[in-house]
């Protein structure tokens, strides 16, 4: 943060304590009272101002990803992909773009331990010369549900019981038993990767398919992958309990201390690309957010590196007020038809307006670092001083005009208006393939987690049978092992 820009200039600074209006404060310890024992007088303006400010100094926490930590750095292109995209920040090897990155847990509150089993958020804001690009992802490549109509229920099921405020397995397994597509995400959620050692040792994924468009207008679907150069490291359940009991902010501290010591975290960015003409060649829908793309058919392509080399200057200003939005894209990158992505474009901006205010994009951490101009005006906590006489467009008195058209996908979309699921669900194949790729001890930890969750006394026989059926359809031996430890017969 630039002190000369975001703090009072030296011409107006003072070594003495003042009110917000600049009036001198000569006592910051004792309230103004009638006699030494009181009562307190309401005319003690600074007391009232101090308390009123304190009462309002926090904003509503994020409904998800409330617990998190941020750091700043740069993204550098290392490999030429200009044949795939006309995005300026990806224009050529050596090009650098300033970034801010936020890591988080998903479900629990702002002060919760960072060692709990949970998906982690991995969000990167690129301050490009063409506007901000927000790649808002997680440390797993898939999500529980493919349609946003289920998203609020998904989060409520994962969050604590509204009566007791305790996270309970029976609620999670009850809800997701109606969403068989969630099994693939459970193959990550109940796996080691949802107990990362810290933020530096975890992968990141854009999760959704996007589109890259080159200067000729040719589009390719794309998925983004972040690979940590220091490798992936995870904790056991026992280690997580010990670490969380010792320091509930262990991952934040590790990130901060590593950067302060000059041990800068680094990730390599890879992409997978797919020609839109090949979408129907797979036994699943490539735009289904509950699926991954096979790397043997669509190999990882190296793009660049992300280096975090600066700690934030103020946690509230650059972490709590930091706002991401998948709707923030730049020329050369576009959305896919992924149903969940399409609705996140609206939902993220909406929640930031509620959480921070309608002018959240004017905050330094959120504002683009390139020129920007529109007629979005005024509103609560507006921080701009504009003296234009014309606040409409078009106008012969204002030289502002629409930007030149940049390439966007030109595919033809058609179909009946309907509420339905996608044709190729294929809910279990990839979950089974992931399970079979593990060593036996890792499989055993996964099975034990299922047994522990399904042993919740409020999980009914019906719910257990449904989940054993799902697990058996993914991998017969996995379902049998869970069933045998629960003494429940698998049903197909």
UniProtKB/Swiss-Prot annotation:
Any idea which GO molecular function terms this record carries? Answer: catalase activity; heme binding; metal ion binding
The alphabetical list of record keywords is:
Heme, Hydrogen peroxide, Iron, Metal-binding, Oxidoreductase, Peroxidase, Peroxisome
Which residues are recorded as binding heme?
Answer: 348
Q: What is its EC number?
A: 1.11.1.6
Q: Which Gene3D superfamilies match?
A: Catalase core domain
Q: In which compartments does the protein localize?
A: Peroxisome
Reaction(s) catalysed by this chain, per the record, are: 2 H2O2 = O2 + 2 H2O
Names of required cofactors? heme
Say yes or no: keyword Transferase present.
no
Gene Ontology cellular component list? cytoplasm; peroxisome; plasma membrane
Q: Which SMART domains match?
A: Catalase
Q: PROSITE patterns, per this entry?
A: CATALASE_1, CATALASE_2, CATALASE_3
Class of enzymatic activity (EC top level): oxidoreductase
What's an example GO BP annotation here?
A: response to hydrogen peroxide
| PANTHER family in the record | CATALASE, CATALASE ISOZYME 1
Q: Which family does it belong to?
A: Belongs to the catalase family.
> What is its quaternary makeup?
Homotetramer.
Name of the protein this chain belongs to: Catalase isozyme 1
Species name: Solanum lycopersicum (Tomato)
Source lineage: Eukaryota, Viridiplantae, Streptophyta, Embryophyta, Tracheophyta
What gene is it encoded by? CAT1
């Amino acid at each position: 943060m630039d002190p000369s820009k975001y703090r009072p200039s030296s011409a107006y600074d003072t070594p003495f304590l003042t009110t917000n209006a600049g009036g001198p404060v000569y006592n910051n310890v004792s309230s103004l009272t009638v006699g030494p024992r009181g009562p307190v007088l309401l005319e003690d303006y600074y007391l009232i101002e101090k308390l009123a400010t304190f009462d309002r100094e926090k904003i509503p926490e994020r409904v998800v990803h409330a617990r998190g930590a941020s750091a700043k750095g740069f993204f550098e292109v290392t490999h030429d992909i200009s044949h795939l995209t006309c995005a300026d920040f990806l224009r050529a090897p050596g090009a650098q773009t300033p970034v801010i990155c936020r890591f988080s847990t998903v479900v629990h509150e702002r002060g919760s331990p960072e060692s709990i089993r949970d998906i982690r958020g991995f969000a990167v804001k690129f301050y490009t010369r063409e506007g901000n690009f927000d790649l808002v992802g997680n440390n797993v490549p898939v999500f529980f549900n493919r349609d946003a109509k289920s998203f609020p229920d998904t989060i409520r099921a994962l969050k604590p019981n509204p009566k007791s405020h305790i996270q309970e397995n029976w609620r999670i397994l009850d809800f997701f038993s109606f969403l068989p597509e969630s099994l693939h995400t459970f193959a990550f959620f109940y796996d080691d990767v949802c107990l990362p050692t810290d933020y530096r040792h975890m992968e990141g994924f854009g999760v959704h398919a996007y589109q890259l468009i080159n200067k000729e207008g040719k589009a390719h679907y794309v998925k983004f992958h972040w690979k940590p150069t220091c490798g992936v490291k995870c904790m056991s359940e026992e280690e997580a309990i010990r670490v969380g009991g010792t320091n509930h902010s262990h991952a934040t501290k590790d990130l901060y201390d590593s950067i302060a010591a000059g041990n800068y975290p680094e990730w390599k960015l890879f992409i997978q690309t797919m020609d839109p003409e090949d979408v129907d060649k797979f036994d699943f829908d490539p735009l289904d957010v509950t699926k991954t793309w096979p790397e043997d058919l669509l190999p990882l392509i190296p793009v660049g590196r992300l280096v975090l080399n600066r700690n934030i200057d103020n946690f509230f200003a650059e972490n709590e007020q930091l706002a991401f939005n998948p709707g923030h894209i730049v020329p050369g990158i576009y959305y896919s038809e992924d149903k969940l992505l399409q609705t996140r474009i609206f939902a993220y901006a909406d929640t930031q307006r509620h959480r921070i205010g309608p002018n959240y994009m004017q905050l330094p951490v959120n504002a683009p670092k390139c020129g920007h101009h529109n007629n979005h005006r005024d509103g609560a906590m507006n921080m701009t001083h504009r003296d234009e006489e014309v606040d409409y467009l078009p106008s012969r008195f204002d030289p502002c005009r629409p930007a030149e058209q940049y390439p966007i996908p030109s595919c033809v979309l058609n179909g009946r208006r309907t509420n339905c699921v996608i044709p190729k669900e294929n809910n279990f194949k990839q979950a089974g393939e992931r399970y079979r790729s593990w060593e036996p001890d890792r499989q055993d930890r996964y099975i034990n987690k299922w047994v522990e969750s399904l042993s919740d006394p409020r999980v009914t026989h019906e719910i257990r049978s449904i989940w054993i059926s799902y697990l058996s359809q993914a991998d017969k031996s996995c379902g049998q092992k869970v069933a045998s430890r629960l003494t429940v017969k698998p049903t197909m």
